[in-house]
Amino acid sequence: MTDQSWEILSNQFVAVAGLLYFLALISILVEWASLRRLPAEEVVTTGRTAMFGRLGLILTGMAVVAHFVALVGRGMAADPNRVPWGNMYEFTLSGTFVVAGAFLLLRSRLGLAWMGPIVVTLVLSLLMVDVIWLHEPVAPLTEALFSPWLVIHVVSAILATGAFTLAGICSALYLVKDRARPRQTGYLARVPPPAVLDRVSYRLHSFGFPIWTFAVLITGPIWAHQAWSSYWNWDPKEVWAFITWVVYAAYLHARSTAGWKGRNAAIVALVALATLWFNFIGINFFSSTSQHSYASGAARIETRG
């Protein structure tokens, strides 16, 4: 296949993934709507309700597979072939894949079925923004991006971002669920108790933080030194990545030493998530000096003479 054929294939599978995510969301919403008027203790899952739940899960799995094919096609379309992380479009495409994939992997292990409507809505919305406003033709990478440290650094950052995003959803639902006590119906009735949300959020944060540390404080500086002969350049994205690390460190420190749980911990977690997503998106649009800026054009990172 030619590079152009791979790019067309990638675009087609992005569209397929979007359609499958949309159908999955409809199935999940139908499942939840059938239970909307009953409190959790009175719910009786019918065969039809279970069918829509299974269908939503299957469609989400199919969407993730199509999403993965789109990523592979994007990387194969470049000459030479590369990882699909050269611009904001590709990074968002990869990040949404990780969020959806992490949800599927952790759905049974952590009992996250109740997170389905939010995760699928989030992924579908970001995918639409990515296609409509951020899409760019495949382009070669600059010299600084041709490094094995790029793969290690970005994979770590994406994995941590996926875990932190799921944890942030738990924290937000904790605040909503806790405020809506005592009697709840509809979607909130299916969401676990606040104590469970708090525990799941903590576990996801504990998983993501070491990976984020590895990405920000180890692989990032090594890659920067290799590309620009300096471990730290006071680049806006570097600074905000470190600020994000500090806020998440404060969250985990407060929980482990000061015993923070519940509402206070959830608020700090959401502040941390806000810094994370500002670093991911905001820097690209508010700072034209960032070496990591992917706001427009392919691979904005420049080499230094």
Model-based region annotation:
Residues 1-305:
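Polytopic transmembrane helical bundles with strong interfacial aromatic enrichment
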